[in-house]
Amino acid sequence: MMSFVQKVSLFILAVFQPSVILAQQDALGGCTHLGQEYADRDVWKPEPCQICVCDSGSVLCDDIICDDQELDCPNPEIPLGECCPVCPQTTPQPTELPYTQGPKGDPGSPGSPGRTGAPGPPGQPGSPGAPGPPGICQSCPSISGGSFSPQYDSYDVKAGSVGMGYPPQPISGFPGPPGPSGPPGPPGHAGPPGSNGYQGPPGEPGQPGPSGPPGPAGMIGPAGPPGKDGEPGRPGRNGDRGIPGLPGHKGHPGMPGMPGMKGARGFDGKDGAKGDSGAPGPKGEAGQPGANGSPGQPGPGGPTGERGRPGNPGGPGAHGKDGAPGTAGPLGPPGPPGTAGFPGSPGFKGEAGPPGPAGASGNPGERGEPGPQGQAGPPGPQGPPGRAGSPGGKGEMGPSGIPGGPGPPGGRGLPGPPGTSGNPGAKGTPGEPGKNGAKGDPGPKGERGENGTPGARGPPGEEGKRGANGEPGQNGVPGTPGERGSPGFRGLPGSNGLPGEKGPAGERGSPGPPGPSGPAGDRGQDGGPGLPGMRGLPGIPGSPGSDGKPGPPGNQGEPGRSGPPGPAGPRGQPGVMGFPGPKGNEGAPGKNGERGPGGPPGTPGPAGKNGDVGLPGPPGPAGPAGDRGEPGPSGSPGLQGLPGGPGPAGENGKPGEPGPKGDIGGPGFPGPKGENGIPGERGPQGPPGPTGARGGPGPAGSEGAKGPPGPPGAPGGTGLPGLQGMPGERGASGSPGPKGDKGEPGGKGADGLPGARGERGNVGPIGPPGPAGPPGDKGETGPAGAPGPAGSRGGPGERGEQGLPGPAGFPGAPGQNGEPGGKGERGPPGLRGEAGPPGAAGPQGGPGAPGPPGPQGVKGERGSPGGPGAAGFPGARGPPGPPGNNGDRGESGPPGVPGPPGHPGPAGNNGAPGKAGERGFQGPLGPQGAIGSPGASGARGPPGPAGPPGKDGRGGYPGPIGPPGPRGNRGESGPAGPPGQPGLPGPSGPPGPCCGGGVASLGAGEKGPVGYGYEYRDEPKENEINLGEIMSSMKSINNQIENILSPDGSRKNPARNCRDLKFCHPELKSGEYWIDPNQGCKMDAIKVYCNMETGETCLSANPATVPRKNWWTTESSGKKHVWFGESMKGGFQFSYGDPDLPEDVSEVQLAFLRILSSRASQNITYHCKNSIAYMNQASGNVKKALKLMSSVETDIKAEGNSKYMYAVLEDGCTKHTGEWGKTVFEYRTRKTMRLPVVDIAPIDIGGPDQEFGVDVGPVCFL
């Protein structure tokens, strides 16, 4: 529940929150806008693309929306002061002279590489892919398929039911799916040959022809310039082990070692025997440090040294001569990687590859430079106890070694000679108190001797033999508790825990206060390539290119250099919600604070700076487990579930023609850094090598590549429990819990009238003790009291000065593991540290393994037409053609001597075929052949150019409401709210302490100070506070706030539109509700029909029916469109809204409803008798289709610009039958200003037997 103060704040914000940008002016009807005064109904344009109107003292402004009609000019211009582009006046261009193409020249020498272009502006983010199916929960209990429905109930993604008619007239449902294709008709008869048509546009490029024979070898080109230096090679393999060096010289004494790790806690010692009281001896001089022991056995071989730094890059090799061009090879491999693209969504984690084979054991390399500090590995297993070595001779002081990491604890060795005093170790936890020994007799107190003069330092004595092991001494008296240590260094972040089981859905928590705006994080690394975007709109068709002769395919060109980034494209439609990003790294653990007792609330002080990180304190004892808390309030609905996998890949594009051979490109930019390779298995341990001589410091090499991470070590023993880390980042929200059962609605009680003033009540109970008075003057000193009992033990004193370091004690035996403590209370979250500076760039990693193939890319845009190719080689001789027609008649020979008429001879043999005649004209088109069997699948050609854009399709039906978008950035903290009302008086406090110190204080007290004069106080208040009135007012205000925050669609509490009503009350059914889009006075609210399935707001026309009759009679029927409301007798334009309200009220509410909506739709049903509404069945065209008039007085037609085309859901008026039929029109648009329809204009009317009527459907906004 929301507190009263919060609700009052929301009430005040809601009252003063304007819902629409309006400038409310004085009540005289005039308006003032931007310092200019306007009269009522004045219209002006403050900007070229904005128009405003003064409406009864209110300024309504709207943007001018240009028609989406395509202009038939390449570069439209916007005139000065106008908003929409127009085609400029162009002058005819001079015609170009024809030209002939010369032979192809030799390739020129490569130019010098150009300067790197300036980076282009960042492109608009691509549209995310469609959401995929929900993921599968591996650890969830098995559930039936129906249990996912609660997760999607909040999105209202439901199957569309059969549309119910809107009373009182029915509305046709959505069109059914298209029927199956009919069988092909029989071939028609051959028609007469048509006349020659005009020259058609160039056809689509044909399939590429077969590869021609390779051309002759070209001339060898001149040698190119030497290439740039290559990138450094990968690090070489470790070299062979060198010869052992000579023993080094004696090094300087090393620095004192770091304090050793804290030893295991020893066992409790036995009670010692009672000692004899000895005389206190004089303090002996400090002995000289003993000689170092002999070096022990050589230890096992150390781990393989770190990888050495890579050597300097080699010089560039000589540039070889260009070889002769070979034959055209197959499609080459992908070119070098381009520059890194914009970051895309993270891909899914791939499966771990199989472990590689164990490599051969390499020789240990030379020791590399010390690397950066790595993360601490897991503790190794406990090694075997070492053997006790025999005491060796004193060795020379060795060189200072590099401090090693703490090794595993060895077995308990023999006690060594007492060493020199080391630095004080870390303070250990206090041991358990030992048993008290028997009290010894006190020795005689010696006299204090005089300080002697310090003697000269004697020479070091010879090393004594090792003495026998002494008995362990008795435990000392437990020391006083030490001061609290400073906080420890920040611990390393713990590894990610296993995912917990899915918890039950929590109840709704109360909203927390807004946190301060966090500092800007470090710049993240570039993401991987994004998922394929939505398919782009087809481009404008290019001008037809000239037909070039197909040339032979050229040799494969080398990849060219990356071009400069193109300009940013236009902003695309907003995409659906993308995949969620990967889980961020765990935050660094915060400081553990002690849980203090809750103090009284203080006034908020200014935020202090973050303090330095302190040293770690000793771990406290585990507290008892807390009681289980009460369940919290119901939680808010969870965030949207994870999107599914990527959608199916699109169809492959058509193959395109091969382009001409490109020039040789310069060297490409280096590709993005690859991922680290899979680490190999750990090789076997090599034999220990002898200690080499210490070499001089070598020159600093270039920074080497970061080596792959080593294999994980064997699991160590159980480590000490680490400090509690900072709370990690908030995990992903769990799935929303199941929807609770609907509660029974309680009856709303009417507000009671204020009761009559009651009689004055009886005297109330004694009030709580008043505030403490001012302190009195200091009294006289009293007599000394009797000595009190012994006090409890005092707290630890201040820390004394540091004592001399004691000798190192024997390491105690390891103690047993303690029982795990109970879970401590959760400490308060630490203060947020300041953002650290961005870390230095890490070394470049080695090349990663090739990634998996990316998803199928989208079809590319149509490339620019290529230049005409070179002339092809002559084709092979074709097969002989069919015999030609008879040749032309030969010329007449000279006249012969006339012979006698002979008898007709017998028919001769067929003569030899004549020569091939000229090619005849093309015959008429033959009948369509039968469908052939599908051919074999051809080889995949290169992608073809994109076809010209098709006509705009009809508007689709509105899709379901998409899922809620991602949570926006956190807003800035709002201003402080007004002070809340004073709270109710609290209950009476507990009785104060009585009488001081008990029975002993009943005696005579001390004399008090002399009193002051009279004190004047206020008269008692006559009128008591009436809590009933206050509670009644609070309840009334609370109800008003609830109504503002959650309107119910009633006349007294209207909503802005049906979509808001659906979000606030998803349980409501479709029906009539009250809305007030302009959020003004409730008296101008309008009643609408709410479709709760989609959230649409529907207004009915008034009247909604045009009667069926003969509305228009003329002799020239069917010649032009006639508007029903403008031209026909008795006709009217369609109006919408409540007829009882003034016309301007409905217009204003409709204007605001358009602003609050993103799309609109409306159906018009035309009833016909011998009148064609859309398709003329006789002619097969739509020349007699009627027109609709939009609210902005533009025609909505059957053909033309698709933005102004209606759809036809049912067409029953295609011919004159003498019977009534109907045609249903539908218009959907995202330009809400175009609806509703205000008039209709049929064309096939005017005859005495032609009648029509209209049903105007409701206009629906979403």
Curated annotation (Swiss-Prot):
Instruction: Output the Pfam families linked to this UniProt entry.
Output: COLFI (PF01410), Collagen (PF01391), VWC (PF00093)
Q: What is its main location?
A: secreted
Location of 5-hydroxylysine modifications: 262, 283, 859
Question: Which segments show compositional bias classed as Basic and acidic residues?
Answer: 228-240, 265-274
Query: Gly residues bias located where?
Result: 389-414, 641-650, 692-701, 863-872
Q: Where in the cell is it found?
A: Secreted, Extracellular space, Extracellular matrix
| Region called Disordered, residue ranges | 95-143, 160-1000
Q: Which residues form the VWFC domain?
A: 29-88
- Which residues have a glycan attached per UniProt? 1163
- Any one annotated GO CC term: extracellular space
Residues of the Fibrillar collagen NC1 domain: 1028-1262
Cystine pairs annotated here are 1058-1090, 1098-1260, 1168-1213
Which residues lie in Low complexity bias regions?
102-118, 192-201, 253-264, 276-295, 339-376, 534-549, 631-640, 672-684, 723-738, 781-790, 802-817, 828-838, 927-940
Instruction: Please list where the region (Nonhelical region (C-terminal)) is annotated.
Output: 995-1003
Q: Could you list this entry's UniProt keywords, alphabetically sorted.
A: Calcium, Collagen, Disulfide bond, Extracellular matrix, Glycoprotein, Hydroxylation, Metal-binding, Repeat, Secreted, Signal
Can you name one GO molecular function term for this protein? Answer: metal ion binding
Q: Does the keyword Metal-binding apply?
A: yes
Q: Which residues form the propeptide?
A: 24-150, 1018-1262
Per the record, the similarity remark reads: Belongs to the fibrillar collagen family.
Q: What is this protein called?
A: Collagen alpha-1(III) chain
Q: Which organism is it from?
A: Gallus gallus (Chicken)
